[in-house]
């Protein structure tokens, strides 16, 4: 998609409250010791919304409630999120608790119940401590200040080491339109959606069905192309809210600036996806895999994700070992039809394989480049014109330690 980069500007100090109409808050209520664990995003008016959910067949209670809310009118005005407890596999009581969270939020913020989404993340199979939740929700006072947006980003974290935020400005109908996002995710990342939550705000004027189409397509190229450990979760989703307060004409696929909006949405999702991959549990390196010259985009993405999801590739990268044999082995495991004689592989811009034949390279130079925190693997199939990318991280000793002691 060709879009003038000049029409998109990254706002380094922007946040989810930068788009017109949004406020946020994050606070500590006692679900996690000494850390923020409850947050909310609120819109001044009912906002068009869209969502993409985990494909795990076991879906947590908050996800079911959010689906119910969005299906009613395709609008949201508030999102309430807790961390420290997933409210997953908690039976009928868990579903009742999630609906109560929605009702409490609606009453507190003065909005319709079906305008409230709820999300939870944390330990599975533990009942939600509703007495703490009830007392906590009534203390939420969202604000339009950037520091409150940052407090929300902290409140949704679990094993994450860093908050994940991004914001862009674009020109639609000659007017400034902003779009921002926040996410959490560190372990159990292998979406079609998995163990990650992301919330996107924009003041673009766009209807529910159009926004849903754009979000679904972009999620497939961004969030669904990250993997940390190959496990999918029960709770996770991406929700986008559009206040419409930029006062442009309605944006749809026929709008002259449609591609600009889609590009900005993709940049937000891609930024957050990379931040999640980079913050994988125990991770020390971000791995980006680009597959070029494939017959279809889907095949390119499948190969890229196969490579970045390989435990052997991950451990080689962690050990700063240029073992490209693990990369080509992963390509062969992808179940995509390839020509085994025409494959090129570059690692950190150094050619290690050409037409499927090993190439001489400086081990010393390679070792130095593999010490960097961002690792790039490029694969050229020479079969077609399509490309695809995926993101992940290395696999370290610390990952095992974190997950062996998660409940303790």
UniProtKB/Swiss-Prot annotation:
InterPro entries registered for this protein in UniProt: Arg_biosynth_ArgJ (IPR002813), ArgJ-like_dom_sf (IPR016117), ArgJ_beta_C (IPR042195)
**Annotated Gene Ontology cellular component terms:** cytoplasm
Catalytic activity entry: N(2)-acetyl-L-ornithine + L-glutamate = N-acetyl-L-glutamate + L-ornithine; L-glutamate + acetyl-CoA = N-acetyl-L-glutamate + CoA + H(+)
Catalytic site: 195
GO terms in the biological process aspect are: L-arginine biosynthetic process; ornithine biosynthetic process
Enzyme class name: transferase
Q: In which pathway does it act?
A: Amino-acid biosynthesis; L-arginine biosynthesis; L-ornithine and N-acetyl-L-glutamate from L-glutamate and N(2)-acetyl-L-ornithine (cyclic): step 1/1; Amino-acid biosynthesis; L-arginine biosynthesis; N(2)-acetyl-L-ornithine from L-glutamate: step 1/4
SUPFAM superfamilies reported for this sequence: DmpA/ArgJ-like (SSF56266)
Q: Which domain of life is it from?
A: Bacteria
Question: Where does the protein end up?
Answer: Cytoplasm
EC numbers, comma separated: 2.3.1.35, 2.3.1.1
**Residues that, per the record, bind substrate:** 158, 184, 195, 281, 403, 408
* Annotated site residues (Cleavage) in this chain: 194-195
Q: What does this protein do?
A: Catalyzes two activities which are involved in the cyclic version of arginine biosynthesis: the synthesis of N-acetylglutamate from glutamate and acetyl-CoA as the acetyl donor, and of ornithine by transacetylation between N(2)-acetylornithine and glutamate.
Which NCBIfam families does this UniProt record tie to the protein?
ArgJ (TIGR00120), PRK05388.1 (NF003802)
Please report which protein family the annotation says this sequence is part of: Belongs to the ArgJ family.
**Per its record, how is this protein called by name?**
Arginine biosynthesis bifunctional protein ArgJ
Organism per entry: Bacillus cereus (strain ZK / E33L)
């Amino acid at each position: 998609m060709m879009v003038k980069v000049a029409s998109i500007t990254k706002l380094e100090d922007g946040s989810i409250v930068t788009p017109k109409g949004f406020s946020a808050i994050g606070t500590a209520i006692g679900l996690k010791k000494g850390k923020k664990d409850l947050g909310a995003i609120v819109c001044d008016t009912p906002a068009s919304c869209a969502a993409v959910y985990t494909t795990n067949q076991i879906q947590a209670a908050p996800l079911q409630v959010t689906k119910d809310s969005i299906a009613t009118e395709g609008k949201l005005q508030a999102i309430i999120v807790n961390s420290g407890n997933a409210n997953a596999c908690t039976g009928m009581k868990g579903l009742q608790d999630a609906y109560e969270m929605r009702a409490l939020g609606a009453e507190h913020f003065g909005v319709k119940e079906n305008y409230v989404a709820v999300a939870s993340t944390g330990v599975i199979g533990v009942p939600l401590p509703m007495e703490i939740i009830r007392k906590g929700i009534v203390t939420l006072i969202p604000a339009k200040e950037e520091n409150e947006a940052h407090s929300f980003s902290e409140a949704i974290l679990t094993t994450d080491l860093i908050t994940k935020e991004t914001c862009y400005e674009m020109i639609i109908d000659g007017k400034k339109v902003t779009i921002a996002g926040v996410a959490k995710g560190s372990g159990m990342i292998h979406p079609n959606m998995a163990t990650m939550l992301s919330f996107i705000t924009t003041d673009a004027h766009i209807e529910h069905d159009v926004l849903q189409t754009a979000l679904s397509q972009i999620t497939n190229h961004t969030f669904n192309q990250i993997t940390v450990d190959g496990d999918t979760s029960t709770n996770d989703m991406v929700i986008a809210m559009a206040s419409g307060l930029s006062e442009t004409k309605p944006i749809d696929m026929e709008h002259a600036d449609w591609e600009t909006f889609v590009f900005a949405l993709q940049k937000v999702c891609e930024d957050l996806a990379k931040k999640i991959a980079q913050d994988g549990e125990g991770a020390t390196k971000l791995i980006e895999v680009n597959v070029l010259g494939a017959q279809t985009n889907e095949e390119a993405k499948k190969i890229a994700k196969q490579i970045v999801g390989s435990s052997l590739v991950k451990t080689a990268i962690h050990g700063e070992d240029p073992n490209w044999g693990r990369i080509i082995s992963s390509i062969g495991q992808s179940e995509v039809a390839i020509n085994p004689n025409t494959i090129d592989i570059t690692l950190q811009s150094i050619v290690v394989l050409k037409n499927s034949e090993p190439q001489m390279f400086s081990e010393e130079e390679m070792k130095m480049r593999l010490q960097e925190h961002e690792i790039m693997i490029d694969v050229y199939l020479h079969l077609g014109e399509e490309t695809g990318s995926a993101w992940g991280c290395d696999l370290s000793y610390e990952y095992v330690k974190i997950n062996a002691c998660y409940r303790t």
